[in-house]
């Protein structure tokens, strides 16, 4: 929403509503698929053990179906925003960025969390895409301003990642996640968190 409100010159309520609900549904879909893939690890961690799938409040297949349906609805709503700026006559730029965000989050970030600390850099990309998606929904274009907004949003996530891995280190190790600076509470991670937070 912030990207839209910063980039828009003439506010369009219908466009804004499509963006809010489309973005909400695509984000929910990505989170749903993530929880389907990580259900056995979520059950091992205090922070995530009460999620619906580990608690058996919803079956895996129903969670996948629900995630697919809301993702499809989200992409449909986003595809209605400036459809004349579509890729190959199918995806609007807004829906293309929504799809890119979901794909990176589910297919790259989620599996990489158990393989390498590189995952936090990958995970910061879909975390920063919403501001880009909002800007493109407002302007149907790119530029230096949105690049700066994307970079700020990208960098602001590192204090978040570092602080969680610092506090929840034992839980992440138990579940097999390789979080950045887990168990290494020194000057370097604290300095990196501080520097990236002032941008």
Where are these regions (language model features)?
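Multi-pass membrane catalytic core of lipid/isoprenoid biosynthesis enzymes
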Residues: 47-96, 185-199
């Amino acid at each position: 929403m912030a990207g839209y409100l910063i980039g828009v010159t003439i506010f369009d309520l219908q466009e804004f509503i499509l963006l809010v609900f489309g973005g909400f549904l695509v984000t929910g879909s990505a989170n749903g698929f993530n929880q389907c893939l990580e259900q056995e690890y979520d059950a091992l961690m205090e922070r995530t053990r009460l999620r619906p799938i580990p608690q058996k409040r919803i079956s895996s297949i129903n969670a996948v179906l629900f995630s697919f349906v809301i993702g499809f609805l989200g992409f449909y709503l986003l595809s209605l925003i400036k459809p004349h700026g579509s890729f190959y006559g199918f995806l609007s730029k807004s829906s293309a960025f929504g799809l890119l965000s979901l794909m990176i989050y589910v297919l790259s970030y989620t599996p990489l969390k158990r393989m390498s600390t590189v995952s936090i850099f990958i995970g910061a990309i879909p975390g920063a895409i919403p501001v880009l998606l909002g800007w493109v929904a407002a302007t149907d274009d790119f530029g230096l301003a949105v690049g700066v907004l994307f970079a700020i949003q990208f960098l602001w996530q590192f204090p978040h990642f570092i602080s969680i891995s610092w506090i929840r280190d034992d839980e992440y190790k138990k579940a097999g996640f390789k979080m950045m600076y887990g168990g290494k509470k020194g000057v370097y991670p604290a300095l990196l968190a501080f520097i990236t937070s002032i941008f």
